[in-house]
Amino acid sequence: MEEGITRIGVSLPKNLLDEFDRIISTRGYSSRSEAIRDAIRTYITEYRWLESEKGEIVGVLVVLYDHHVKGVSDLLIDLQHDFHEIITSSTHIHLNEDQCLEMILVKGKMERIKVLVDKISAARGVMNVKLISAVKKV
């Protein structure tokens, strides 16, 4: 159980807040604060899992990004070439006129895959990055 409550302020784009409020209503949260605490706990759990994985894995890196952001498409291509030893293939999907989804199949040492995840996550224009570990190599 958490100790005490600390009040913080967060700036969000209106469309992101509207979508969050819609989800809060659908899921039955009593407040934004409760939903934000839940989202932060989920993020921390996923981060800890990513940090704890070791050894060789096979998985898919799912990247959602806004292709209108200058340089993001080129950066993703450059990173795929820079990490060619762990990337077996990739698929590019046009979701709408603004957003693209890149599915990158990875196979290799988790430590190296984490570096790729961090570089993609930090890129301006990238909206979401998710690593799904399909198989742990033996």
Swiss-Prot record:
Entry keyword Lipid biosynthesis: no
CDD domains assigned to the protein according to its UniProt record, in alphabetical order: RHH_NikR_HicB-like
GO BP annotation list: response to nickel cation
Cofactor descriptive note: Binds 1 nickel ion per subunit.
Necessary cofactors: Ni(2+)
Gene3D superfamilies in alphabetical order: ACT-like. Chain A, domain 2, Met repressor-like
UniProt keywords, alphabetically: DNA-binding, Metal-binding, Nickel, Transcription, Transcription regulation
GO molecular function: DNA binding; DNA-binding transcription factor activity; nickel cation binding
Residues the record lists as binding Ni(2+): H81, H92, H94, C100
Top-level taxonomic group: Archaea
Pfam families: NikR_C, RHH_1
Record function comment: Transcriptional regulator.
Record family assignment: Belongs to the transcriptional regulatory CopG/NikR family.
Assembly and interaction partners: Homotetramer.
Name of the protein: Putative nickel-responsive regulator
Organism lineage: Archaea, Methanobacteriati, Methanobacteriota, Archaeoglobi, Archaeoglobales
